[in-house]
């Protein structure tokens, strides 16, 4: 279960980790009041459970309380990567000298707990691992022994911190381990952790993920279980679809988890970016196809819809009728690329071609076409 940034920072603060002064606002007026208490320049951060919110306009600045109210009104009126903004964290603007990356996580592939340390703060961990492996330090933690002070010394040296800040690093890393242990967290991340202009270490951003299986031990969070679903994921769950939201622009609808994952891999292979995982299941009815297609057609991020169906117990003619009805009911005119193969394929193909859709028999051809359309629409 993902915690909101303000919740993660509250835990960090209670464990002695320095965080910026701030407060939560549910309205623009509350944002102004919080900004007045802080005084001076502030940063307003949309509390959403998606990544890269800064790039999506979810982090804005204000020079005074009146401007903070205006900026908050703007934030509350928008969606950040598909999520409606209902809470804003208003914080003092920190004068940053240097940014770092610091996390404590469970490396499941190697079955170990590790600190990940990098001088490249603000960079996603996936990008660090892939592009800058020499800028990433791994410090293994034996769960029997736990955190030891030498770990913070290794981290401080790697980051090039002045020696007067080594005690701060020790306190932060020790607290991170205690948070993981006490909250059953599988991720405690500060990105960035910064050295301020006044030579202090502060966690400017914080992320904590709690193991779902331990929620019975954390009543304060258990009540909110499931809230990490995006709006689209919540709708899909109510409709009974297997759906996961991603960051791409090619909507994907298939029957069967294996075919869906294979289609996503093909999209990535040909240079596209999947917007989602959506498995309509075997034997899907016209109504089920219609609701799934409507979900993706109405998704703001989806530029083109790719449908890949292998008809066994799923009948291609039912799929075709569902797609046609979805377009008619939503009135959304987005490119749709369709691959049909199997039961009642000829009927389904005829229905779709009568409506002007091109239907492919080979998945490769359909995927290439969808990627081409998405790229052209991005130019």
Swiss-Prot record:
Transmembrane segments: none annotated. Its cofactor is Mg(2+). Pathway: Carbohydrate metabolism; tricarboxylic acid cycle; succinate from succinyl-CoA (ligase route): step 1/1. InterPro entries: ATP-grasp, ATP-grasp_succ-CoA_synth-type, ATP_grasp_subdomain_1, Succ-CoA_synthase_bsu_CS, SUCC_ACL_C, Succ_CoA_ligase-like_bsu, Succinyl-CoA_synth-like. It catalyses: succinate + ATP + CoA = succinyl-CoA + ADP + phosphate; GTP + succinate + CoA = succinyl-CoA + GDP + phosphate. Pfam families: ATP-grasp_2 (PF08442), Ligase_CoA (PF00549). This is Succinate--CoA ligase [ADP-forming] subunit beta. The gene is sucC.
């Amino acid at each position: 279960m993902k915690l909101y940034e303000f919740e993660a920072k509250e835990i960090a603060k209670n464990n002695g980790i320095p965080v910026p002064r701030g407060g939560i606002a549910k309205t623009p007026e509350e944002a102004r009041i919080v900004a007045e208490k802080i005084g001076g320049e502030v940063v307003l951060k949309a509390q959403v459970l998606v990544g890269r919110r800064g790039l999506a306009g979810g982090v804005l600045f204000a020079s005074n309380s009146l401007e903070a109210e205006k900026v908050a009104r703007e934030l509350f009126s928008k969606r950040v990567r598909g999520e409606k903004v209902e809470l804003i964290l208003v914080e003092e603007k920190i004068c940053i000298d240097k940014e770092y990356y610091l996390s404590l996580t469970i490396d499941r592939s190697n079955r170990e707990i590790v600190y990940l340390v990098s001088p490249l703060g603000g960079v996603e961990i996936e990008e660090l691992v892939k592009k800058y492996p020499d800028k990433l330090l791994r410090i293994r933690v034996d769960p029997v022994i736990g955190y030891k002070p030498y770990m913070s010394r290794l981290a401080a040296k790697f980051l090039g911190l002045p020696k007067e800040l080594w005690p701060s690093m020790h306190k932060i890393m020790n607290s991170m381990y205690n948070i993981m242990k006490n909250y059953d967290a599988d991720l405690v991340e500060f990105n960035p952790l910064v050295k301020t202009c006044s030579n202090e270490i502060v966690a400017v951003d914080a992320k904590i993920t709690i193991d779902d299986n331990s929620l019975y031990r954390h009543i304060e969070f258990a009540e909110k279980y499931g809230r990490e679903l995006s709006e689209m994921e919540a709708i899909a769950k109510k409709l009974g679809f297997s759906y996961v939201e991603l960051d791409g622009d090619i909507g994907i609808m298939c029957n069967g988890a294996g075919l869906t994952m294979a289609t996503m891999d093909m999209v990535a292979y040909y240079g596209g970016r999947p917007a989602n995982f959506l498995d309509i299941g075997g034997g899907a009815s016209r109504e089920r196809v219609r609701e799934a297609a409507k979900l993706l057609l109405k998704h703001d991020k989806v530029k083109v819809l790719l449908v890949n169906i292998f008809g066994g117990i799923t009948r291609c003619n039912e799929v075709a009728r569902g797609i046609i009805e979805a377009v008619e009911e939503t009135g959304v005119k987005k490119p749709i690329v369709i691959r049909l193969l199997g039961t009642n394929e000829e009927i389904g193909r005829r229905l779709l071609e009568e409506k002007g859709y091109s239907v492919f028999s080979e998945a490769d051809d359909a995927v290439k076409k969808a990627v081409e359309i998405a790229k052209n629409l991005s130019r």
